[in-house]
């Protein structure tokens, strides 16, 4: 398959970081959350993650082989997709459902659209939504963590947010409550996100704008902003999924618009809809709007003065 050149808005910054190095850093950032999920939900968390990652790598290699493309599983992009997809599953999910999700994420969302760099949406997000729609009962069957507080034993914090107070903040930080693998331990997600920012893998603009928007709207609506920030998939989505290079804007203005949109949609679904969580749908909807955001936030041409009204530019 011939190499394609894609040019986004100038100016352009060159970097010695390869796709492989970037993806490896993302994997490193997710390891603390994986360890936390094993502590909270048991060894099945690790097994489910391993199966999902293996399935993603297999489908990527098999598809490329069948289509006569270069097999580039060593870039770790399929590993990242597999880990993110597993982080969006409960530890009790049957392994074959995880494989179905991996097929949807890698083959349908990523490879059928041209492979890495051409997918219209985050593959793991679409995989999660597809599984939630097709296997709703299994995807909402959250295991009871060890030593969890009664209100959060097997329910997500968002489902019982009205019962939570300041005394439960530590539980939300440590993740000792119901939920999917990668959404419970807020502190490891935050540490992973800070690592990605410190190593310049991601820009802080999208996650900061996203989280700030949710916090402000929570206060305006009379809800506890800390519970909203530490619950559900917000931390995972803000730092690891909304910042995907392919499906997020490249301009700073675009990133701010993107983050604002994510926060507004997430809160609209959480506060006004029938679903407790809205992060996945918010990211998917904003992924679809990225081309329009890019066009309308494109940087002005440098070195050319704007024409004055009634006269030509000098």
Question: Which positions does each model-derived feature cover?
Answer:
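N-terminal signal-anchor module of multipass membrane proteins
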Residues: 1-53, 57, 306-314
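Alpha-helical transmembrane segments in multi-pass membrane proteins
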Residues: 25-33, 48-60, 77-82, 86, ...
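Generic transmembrane alpha-helix motif of multi-pass integral membrane proteins
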Residues: 33-36, 81-90, 104, 189-196, ...
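Structural signature of hydrophobic alpha-helical transmembrane segments
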Residues: 42-55, 92-101, 172, 176-184, ...
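C-terminal ends of transmembrane helices
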Residues: 58-70, 106-117, 189-199, 239-248
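Membrane-interface helix-loop-helix junctions at boundaries between adjacent transmembrane segments
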Residues: 74-78, 83-150
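Long hydrophobic alpha-helical segments that form multi-pass transmembrane helix bundles
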Residues: 117-190
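Loop-to-transmembrane alpha-helix initiation sites
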Residues: 120, 124, 227-234, 254-258, ...
């Amino acid at each position: 398959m011939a190499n394609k050149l894609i040019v986004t808005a100038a100016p352009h910054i060159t970097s010695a970081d390869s796709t492989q190095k970037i993806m490896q850093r993302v994997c490193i950032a997710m390891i603390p959350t994986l360890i936390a999920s094993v502590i909270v939900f048991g060894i099945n968390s690790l097994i489910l993650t391993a199966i999902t990652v293996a399935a993603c790598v297999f489908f990527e290699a098999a598809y490329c082989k069948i289509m006569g493309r270069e097999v580039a599983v060593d870039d770790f992009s399929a590993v990242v997709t597999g880990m993110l997809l597993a982080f969006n599953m409960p530890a009790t999910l049957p392994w074959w459902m995880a494989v179905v999700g991996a097929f949807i994420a890698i083959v349908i969302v990523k490879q059928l659209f041209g492979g890495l760099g051409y997918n219209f949406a985050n593959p793991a997000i679409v995989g999660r939504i597809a599984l939630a729609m097709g296997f709703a009962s299994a995807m909402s069957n959250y295991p009871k963590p060890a030593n969890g507080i009664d209100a959060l034993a097997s329910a997500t914090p968002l489902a019982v947010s009205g019962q939570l107070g300041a005394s439960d903040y530590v539980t939300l930080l440590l993740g000792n409550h119901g939920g999917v693998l990668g959404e419970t331990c807020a502190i490891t997600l935050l540490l992973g996100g800070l690592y990605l920012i410190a190593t310049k893998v991601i820009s802080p603009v999208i996650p900061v704008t996203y989280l700030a928007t949710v916090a402000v709207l929570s206060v305006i609506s009379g809800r506890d902003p800390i519970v909203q920030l530490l619950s559900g998939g917000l931390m995972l989505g803000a730092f690891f999924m909304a910042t995907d290079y392919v499906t997020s804007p490249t301009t700073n203005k675009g990133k701010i618009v993107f983050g604002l949109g994510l926060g507004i949609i997430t809160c609209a679904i959480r506060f006004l809809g029938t679903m407790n969580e809205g992060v996945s749908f918010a990211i998917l909807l904003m992924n679809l709007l990225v081309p329009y955001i890019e066009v309308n936030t494109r940087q002005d041409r440098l070195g050319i003065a704007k024409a004055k009204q009634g006269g030509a530019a000098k």
